[in-house]
């Protein structure tokens, strides 16, 4: 659901993990106006999917517990000041934090799909894939990307982050649901 890594990238990530100590994930931040608007636009599309029997919940509830993980990803682009970026060893060290978030979240939630960041190329190049927009056509594609992971239909929560790079706002999101529900 979060950024998936190729075998070579995973190996670099494992090497990066060996050097750093673990710290507990920070508390999620309150949503910005853009993030709240984005969730409203996503829910408009999500409702149509619910009406068509394609998802289990009529609306997604904004829950920023997973934002820390997607904020790590977005932060790599913000720090690099470029929407297309070749991952460095330093970036890989930062990505270790995603594993910490995932372990923490998986105690409580099952994780669904995500959208907004490409898979790494063979050269470790990644890109922000969705410029911020609340237009139906753009949001439809964004939701379709989230739905590419089949279990996303069970989602009841969404975390979003809108990184700003070179004066443009982008959007990243992931969905999840309670394990015990």
Task: Report each predicted region and the residues it spans.
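C-terminal motif of bacterial Sec signal peptides marking the signal peptidase cleavage site
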Residues: 16-17
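Generic N-terminal leader/processing signal
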Residues: 2, 45, 176-177
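A well-ordered secondary-structure block
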Residues: 92-181
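Short, well-ordered surface patches within globular domains
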Residues: 26-103, 156
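N-terminal secretory signal peptides and thylakoid transit peptides that target proteins
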Residues: 1-13
């Amino acid at each position: 659901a979060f950024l998936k890594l190729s075998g070579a990238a995973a190996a670099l990530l494992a090497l990066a993990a060996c050097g750093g100590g673990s710290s507990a994930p920070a508390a999620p931040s309150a949503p910005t106006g853009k993030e709240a608007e984005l969730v409203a636009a996503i829910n408009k599309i999500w409702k149509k999917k619910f009406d068509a029997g394609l998802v289990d919940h009529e609306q997604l509830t904004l829950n920023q517990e997973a934002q820390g993980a997607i904020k790590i990803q977005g932060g790599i682009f913000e720090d690099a000041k470029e929407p297309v970026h070749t991952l460095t060893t330093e970036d890989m060290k930062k990505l270790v934090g995603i594993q910490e978030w995932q372990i923490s979240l998986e105690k409580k939630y099952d994780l669904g799909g995500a959208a907004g960041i490409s898979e790494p190329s063979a050269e470790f190049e990644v890109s922000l894939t969705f410029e911020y927009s609340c237009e139906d056509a753009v949001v439809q594609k964004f939701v379709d990307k989230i739905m590419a992971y089949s279990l996303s239909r069970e989602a009841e929560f969404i975390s979003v982050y809108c990184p700003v790079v070179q004066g443009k706002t982008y959007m990243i999101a992931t969905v999840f649901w309670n394990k015990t529900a």
